[in-house]
Amino acid sequence: MPFVQRYSDVKKGAIIFAGNTLGLSKAANSNSPGTEGSIGAFTSLNTSLQVGNFPAGTTLDYTLNGSRAQLSLPAGSSVLYAELVWGGLYRSTVNNISNLINNPVVFSTPLSANVQIAPDAATSQDFVITVDNVTVGFYVRSANVTALVAAALSGAYSVQRVPALIEAIDSRTSQTNHAGWTLAVVYENQTLDLRNLTLWSGGNVVSPSTGSTTVTVTNFLTPVSYTHLRAH
């Protein structure tokens, strides 16, 4: 079940996304800054923490990780649905934290601080793949956070305590250390066009070893004639 439909309606409105990484790129075989495309340290909202030569606000402890993003809704908007999605690397050749990936994460809105958000089993997905003869595991979790976002609307949002592994030795993960989050918000605004607003949640793996991937969605309808037909 790569993707699960979470919301669908026809309204004057749109879908907007906010989110952030939870780590900074590493150097080869080291927890130091570099350009390997694999994270070497988590970001943290605590700027008194620092990992080596990484900037302040970094940690190797997932329970201290965190990042912020700005949600900007047009004036006069109301939130119809909001989904928080997060994930990361949970398995390397030497470590496996599958016992932690269903733990709640900490979500803060402009109005509510440090709310524990438990993942919804309906959208929980784990992926085990082999990259360059290295077997690794990724996961995706999500939850409905509509009430929190509808109350807070625009402003700074943050997510903390997302379980994930960081391995310094690249051969343990084939350079796939990662962690991050996305907030998907479906909103209504009477100044916008009438649209079919449908949101799916889930994940799929795309890598050099797996090649391209095809995602099938159902019940997707379009007008017979429309000059501005778009999808995201």
Residue map of PLM features:
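Boundary/junction segments of secreted and surface-exposed precursor proteins
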Residues: 1-27, 194-199
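A short beta-strand-loop element at or near the start of a globular domain
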Residues: 32-83, 214-215
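Extracellular structured ligand-interaction cores
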Residues: 66-68, 79-81, 100-104, 154-156, ...
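Extracellular and analogous surface-interaction loops
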Residues: 68-78, 147-149, 187, 215-226
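Extended, low-complexity, turn-rich repeat/linker tracts enriched in Gly/Pro/Ser/Thr and Asp/Glu
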Residues: 88-97
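Cysteine-clustered segments with highest specificity for TGF-beta superfamily mature ligands
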Residues: 104-174
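Exposed low-complexity, polar/acidic, P/S/T/G-rich flexible segments that act as propeptides
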Residues: 167-205
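Conserved small/polar residues in nucleotide/adenosyl-binding loops
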Residues: 227-232
